[in-house]
Structure formats: structure tokens, C-alpha cells
């Protein structure tokens, strides 16, 4: 908690914005949130991805709050200071979108702009399908809007990758990836946060897919130094939190693909009419298998795609000034009522 407060405070030291950290009971769980900005400002919810925390938005919170938005950034369920339910089905997309709606209810707001990264982007893109009346705008970072597949994601991945290794399939077996990551949280996080870029050589790419008993972390390159966007204090904060909580809650998000497929079979809205923005990085390995060319099958309202040259997966931490500029420009066009 102390590191968390100090980390956010460092980013806000030159502003008049004072963030508030509090616990909120919503949708059957307790979420730790960081909140900043005027209480009567338009609400913007920042939803982080795997393996991150509300802390991953440390560069966006002050910029958005200073622009007059009421910013709410939760540690999502399974992470950080928030509840970590034991049942795997407690992490399905119905529950995850329900958490964001619960934060809106707690804030007394009818609608919000949802901004998500990685898994948080999946939740952000799904919320206007399940709760269309609560979403004024939606932005996804690193994961674009994609149509519901004909079969569950895991079925498609098994057909595509066969006996090859693929991390999403490896994450399916409860306890396996958990044990690997929990054994050395610092090594796990340093490799995931520091090594998740599009491989520059074919051997590295093939290693990520090679069959065998080797786990996920061992396949990632070990960076010889931290990336420029990640300080030693930043890494220490992530390590402290995941050392305390473990990775099981976070990994349980991946174990609900089949449930999510069922839940999204009959959405309240078939498409997204709210203004939408996707921002990706040209060096993001996730975009090698998550294509951006089917967005218009999902989004029928105003839509814009931005690709940042040379950016990797952790885009809001890597390119904070560019991301902030894009988000502020996008939000300035939103009709909030």
C-alpha cells in the first residue's frame, strides 16, 4: 500500500490533483480503487490488463484528472488490493463487466468512458454489448474489438497451434502457470514486462511455440536491463503486490473463455454504437494473432485506429505522452448525456 501511494503521488507531485485510494464494495467483491479529479466531472474508468494493476495507469490518472475528468482506476478482481474469489467462474466476463458497472453505480454516474488495456480492453469492449446504456465511449489499448468467434477461443487455439506451445492454452490448467510464476515473482514480472515485444529474430519466435515441458516464463527473453519506461521502483511495486497475492486470480481470467463465449451469445446489444478508439503498437506481439481488420463487424459508431510505431504491448506505460494526447483528444469529442 505504501509503495502504491508513493508511486501515484510521484506522478501527481506537480499537479493540484490529489488522488484518493479507497475500497469499494461492488458486484459481490471489494475493489481497491484510485480516484482523482473533480467529483462532478465526467467519469472515466481505467481497466488494467495482465499482469498489471491500477498502478499501470500512473501516467494517465493525473493527465485525465487535470483535464476535468473524474478518473477511477481499480485493481480489478483477482489483483492487488481487491478481492480474489476462489471459484474460477467468479472471473467470467459477466462478472468483470459487472464490476465496472458497479463502479459507475458507486460513483452515482449513469454513463462513463471506459478505457482498457490488454484484458482490461476485452472488458471495456464487452461492456457496451452487455450494458450499452452505461457506456458513453470506449477505448481499447493493445487489444482491438473483435467479433465473437464461431467457437470458444480455446477451441480455435487448439486447432491452430495443435501440439505447439501457446501461452493462453498453457494458462488453462489450474495451478500450473500459477506455480511457475509464483516461484519467483520478480523473475516472472521482469521477463513479462521487460521481454514482451515482437521477437526480432526467428529463433526467439519459434521458441515461444516449440512443444515441450518448458513453461511460459522460461521461453521469454531475459532482458539485460529494465526497459526505459519501467523504473526499479515500478518493478518493485509490481513484485511486492504479486508476491503478496500470487498470480492465480489474474490467471483465472484466462480460464473462462468457454463461459465468456456462452455469456456473449445473446448480448443486449449486437454491436457497439458508442464512439470508439483503438491504440496499438507496431511491435506488440499480441497483435500478431489478434488482428485489427474486423473492428467494423463490432463497432458501428464512430471508430478510429491509431498505431504507434515501435511501441510494444505495455503501451500506456511505454508512451504516456502520446497515449494521453490521444485519449484527451478522443474524450473531448464525447457527448456525455
Region annotations inferred by a language model:
Residues 17-18, 29-31, 43, 79-115, ...:
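Flexible "cap/lid" subdomain of the alpha/beta-hydrolase fold that forms the substrate-access gate
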Residues 22-26:
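Short acidic-hydrophobic surface loop/beta-edge motif
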Residues 35-83:
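Conserved HGGG/HGGXW glycine-rich cap/lid loop of the alpha/beta-hydrolase fold
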Residues 49, 92, 318-319:
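Active-site helix-initiating loop/hinge in glycosyltransferases
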Residues 50, 54-57, 119, 125, ...:
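Signature tryptophan residues that serve as conserved aromatic anchors
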Residues 302-337:
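Catalytic active-site module of serine/aspartate enzymes centered on a nucleophile-bearing elbow/loop
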